From Swiss-Prot:
Keywords: DNA damage, DNA repair. Disulfide bonds: none annotated. The keyword Hydrolase does not apply. This is DNA mismatch repair protein MutL. One of its GO terms (cellular component) is mismatch repair complex. This protein is involved in the repair of mismatches in DNA. It is required for dam-dependent methyl-directed DNA mismatch repair. May act as a 'molecular matchmaker', a protein that promotes the formation of a stable complex between two or more DNA-binding proteins in an ATP-dependent manner without itself being part of a final effector complex. Gene3D superfamilies: 3.30.230.10, Histidine kinase-like ATPase, C-terminal domain (3.30.565.10), MutL, C-terminal domain, dimerisation subdomain (3.30.1540.20), MutL, C-terminal domain, regulatory subdomain (3.30.1370.100). GO terms for molecular function: ATP binding; ATP hydrolysis activity; ATP-dependent DNA damage sensor activity; mismatched DNA binding. It holds the Pfam family DNA_mis_repair. Belongs to the DNA mismatch repair MutL/HexB family. The lineage of its organism: Bacteria, Bacillati, Bacillota, Bacilli, Bacillales. Residues 356-382 are annotated as: Disordered.
Length: 669
């Protein structure tokens, strides 16, 4: 008798569920995608005990026809594909027809649905079998309740992480879906507490403000770009809001959240020299393309995709992020540990309302506003390497929604309002800001957040407010300031009417020299300095093999290396712009870079060499400067292409506004 037999449907579904339904967040993702595909404009997600006890998703989409209800829980039953060719033109989020079958095999599922001009129906499924199917009262759309997840697979239930971890993963999925579909009102409720609620205005930056808070939202920069095959749209946060992991990078293709190593790399390349090693940006990028250019049928979770013309897309993302920050003021503000008190308005108006301008006019041109509300000061959840939850008072968590940053302090405080009431210039400035915000909200030039970022912030005078966030004259990106002195022979202290500045002198000169060497290395020049006595270098046999392979690349950075016999090589000339006293050391370092990498990208080699040379030739710490030398250094920095970070991504200038200094000395409360 044969040993091979076809598996029972219930067993096959449980096996399939192992990939599709890994945890409660997988269920939320699949049901949310179904609701979006059904054309819903309002979706509510309610979970109890982080989805382990129950998950309920209610939408106002098209609903399911009565005759289709018997099929929706069958494997590979779907309304989204009909023939082979459809697999290459997928625009829906779901298409495999596996989700409901997999979910119903490991949970108890009740589904109510109603279409236009039809009576409602209810179906109950347990262990993959339909136990009840009857008419029922239901609103248009679908209401699906998933209970007792993994009740019949105890091994899977055993390995569910803590409730905090699972809730965090659910919130993460919903947050990303909300960002990619801002036109849908999405609410997430956990054990009766609202975790997220979007207004469906169609503005992604409003959703990001709801998720990441107003402080980040003020510093979002809009990006947009096209090629013949791709269109990208999104928001990138200023480098000062960088995080310690890649979790805050959100990439979507045709509205689908995906993970892709090359696109992550493109985003980091766009932030090149603006972020230090180990820091990652907050950003949202949606890529629109013909579905034929992307294969989403790689894995049942549909997170992995394969792209055509990936290099073209890579370059588009890099260039648009670089353009976004090219002429922008990126002086980070000092981060004071300041928590506002309740019931007292910091500014002269009762409650700041910030309205995000739509990138394009909506059809009804209905005015939407986003109100800043009081944020809660509470511990955030943080997950360690063992998936255990660690409570930290001051850590940031993407899973915790912050409607806005608080602008409110205690009525009983004194001194601050009295000071401000006497300051007519302050009120004049605030009025100008409000008028500018109003003009921004009423206009439709498509620039969104960048038109008002940093306006009406909880700082006193701030150069970012006065100069604007995008300078028409690149030389004015660094404000004019008076040199006051130097601290520890390392930091230059300067001031102007808006506050105090600290400048890292080594980082400043490193940026200046980096741009000089980078440009020189990239030039093709015949201007060389001949050596009376050639420099001689000795290499082992294996090193010789690498060097011989990359002789042309060395020539492109100005090093003419000639084999002199045996293990010896000579250099008889060098570019005139090489620092004369360091020629031999520079050449050694260049060759070592090649020997370490064992492969060479000429662009990266030029970059690494420029960074290396700039670091060695720059002013070191504990080096005291004359006042005119400090002033000259700031003037040179003002001419730099990117004057705010050193080549390694560390900040060059930090700004303390006048108000922040007053807070430090308790002159204001």
């Amino acid at each position: 008798m044969g040993k091979i037999k076809e598996l029972q449907t219930s067993l096959a579904n449980k096996i399939a569920a192992g990939e599709v339904v890994e945890r409660p967040s997988s269920v939320v993702k699949e049901l949310l995608e179904n609701a979006i595909d059904a054309g819903a404009t309002e979706i509510s997600i309610e979970v109890e005990e982080s989805g382990v006890q129950s998950i309920r998703v209610v939408d106002n989409g098209s609903g399911i026809e009565a005759e289709d209800l018997g099929l929706v829980f069958h494997r590979h039953a779907t309304s989204k594909l009909d023939q082979d060719e459809d697999l290459f033109h997928i625009r829906t989020l779901g298409f495999r027809g596996e989700a409901l079958a997999s979910i119903s095999s490991v949970a108890k599922v009740t589904l109510k649905t109603c279409t236009d001009n039809a009576n409602g129906n209810e179906i109950y499924v347990e262990n993959g079998e339909i136990l009840n199917h009857k008419p029922a009262k239901a609103k248009k759309g679908t209401d699906i309740l998933v209970e007792s997840l993994f009740y019949n697979t105890p091994a899977r239930l055993k390995y569910i992480k803590s409730l905090y971890t699972e809730l965090g993963k659910i919130t993460d999925i919903v947050n990303r879906m909300a960002m990619s579909h801002p036109d849908i009102r999405i609410a997430l409720i956990s054990d009766g507490k609202t975790m997220l609620s979007t207004n469906g205005s169609g503005r992604t930056n409003e959703v990001m403000a709801e998720i990441y808070g107003m402080k980040v939202a003020r510093d979002l920069v809009h990006i947009s770009g096209d090629t013949s095959d791709y269109h990208i749209e999104g928001f990138v946060a200023k480098p000062e809001h960088s995080r310690s992991n890649k979790h805050y990078i959100s990439i979507f293709i045709n509205g689908r959240y995906i993970k892709n190593f090359m696109l992550n790399k493109a985003i980091l390349e766009g932030y090149h020299t603006l972020l230090t090693i180990g820091r990652f940006p907050i950003c949202y990028i949606n890529i629109e393309m013909d579905p034929i250019l992307v294969d989403v049928n790689v894995h049942p979770t549909k997170l992995e995709v394969r792209l055509s013309k990936e290099e073209q897309l890579y370059q588009l993302i890099v260039s648009k992020i670089q353009e976004a920050f090219k002429d922008r003021i990126l002086i980070p503000k000092n981060n004071l540990d300041y928590v506002p008190k309740k019931n007292k308005v910091l500014h002269s108006f009762e409650q700041q309302k910030i309205e995000f301008e739509q990138r394009q006019n909506t059809e009804n041109n209905q005015e939407k506003t986003f109100s800043s509300e009081e944020s809660n000061s509470k511990p955030f959840m943080e997950e360690n390497q063992n998936d255990e939850i660690v409570i930290k008072e001051d850590s940031y968590n993407p899973f915790v929604t912050k409607t806005s940053e608080s602008l409110i302090a205690d009525d009983e405080s004194s001194g601050y309002n009295n000071t401000r009431e006497k300051d007519e210039d302050y009120f004049k400035k605030q009025q100008e800001i409000l008028q500018e915000m109003d003009q921004t909200f009423d206009s439709n030039d498509g620039t969104t957040v960048q038109n008002y970022e940093n306006k009406a912030s909880d700082d006193y005078y701030d150069v970012n407010d006065i100069k604007g966030t995008k300078s028409k004259d690149p030389k004015r990106r660094i404000p004019y300031m008076e040199i006051v002195g130097q601290v520890h022979g390392t930091y230059i202290i300067a001031q102007n009417e808006f506050g105090m500045y600290m400048i890292d002198q080594h980082a400043a000169q490193e940026r200046i020299k980096y741009e000089y060497f980078r440009d020189k290395i990239g030039e093709v020049t015949n201007e060389v300095q001949d050596l009376l006595i050639p420099l001689t270098f000795h290499f082992s046999k294996d090193e010789q093999l690498v060097i011989d392979q990359y002789k042309n690349e060395l020539q492109q950075v100005g090093i003419m290396l000639e084999h002199f016999g045996g293990h010896d090589y000579i250099v008889s000339s060098y570019p005139v712009w090489f620092p004369k006293d360091e020629v031999e050391e520079i050449i050694k370092d260049m060759i070592e870079l090649i020997l370490e990498e064992k492969k060479v990208d000429i662009k990266k080699l030029r970059e690494d060499v420029a960074i290396m040379m700039s670091c060695k030739k720059s002013i070191k710490a504990n080096h005291y400067l004359q006042k005119h030398e400090m002033s000259d250094l700031i003037d040179q920095l003002r001419e730099a292409e990117d004057p705010f970070t050193c080549p390694h991504g560390r900040p060059i200038i930090i700004n303390f506004s006048k108000y922040e200094l007053e807070k430090l000395f308790k002159r204001v409360m």
